[in-house]
Design a protein with these regions (language model features):
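Conserved non-catalytic scaffold segment of RNase H-like nuclease domains
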Residues: 1-92
Length: 92
C-alpha cells in the first residue's frame, strides 16, 4: 500500500467506557512519502490526571483551548479523504 493515512490518539486513560480522546495526530503518505500532517487537541469533558498530562506533554491550557471531539473527527476525516486509514498502537 503506497497511499494511506496513519493516525495516533492520545487519551485520558485506557478505558473505552470512561476515558476520552485528547489528541488526534496523523500523517498522509503518498508514494511512500509524507505528503501532509494533521494534529488537533481535543477539549475533554472530564478532568485529566497529572499522570496523563506528564505522559503526553499536553498541558491543561492546551486542553482548555482544544476543539470539540466532533469537530476534530470531522477535520481528521476531511484530511484523510478516501485513503485507507491505519491506526498506530491500536491494540492497547
Amino acid at each position: 500500500m503506497k497511499d494511506y493515512v496513519a493516525f495516533d490518539l492520545e487519551t485520558t486513560g485506557l478505558s473505552p467506557d470512561s476515558d476520552q480522546i485528547i489528541e488526534i495526530g496523523a500523517v498522509k503518505i503518498r508514494d511512500g512519502k509524507i505528503s501532509g500532517k494533521y494534529n488537533c487537541i481535543i477539549h475533554p469533558e472530564i478532568e485529566v490526571s497529572d499522570f496523563i498530562i506528564n505522559l503526553t506533554g499536553i498541558s491543561r491550557d492546551m486542553l482548555r483551548k482544544g476543539i470539540p471531539l466532533k469537530e476534530g473527527v470531522e477535520e481528521f476525516l476531511e484530511f484523510s479523504g478516501d485513503l485507507p486509514i491505519l491506526g498506530h498502537n491500536v491494540m492497547f
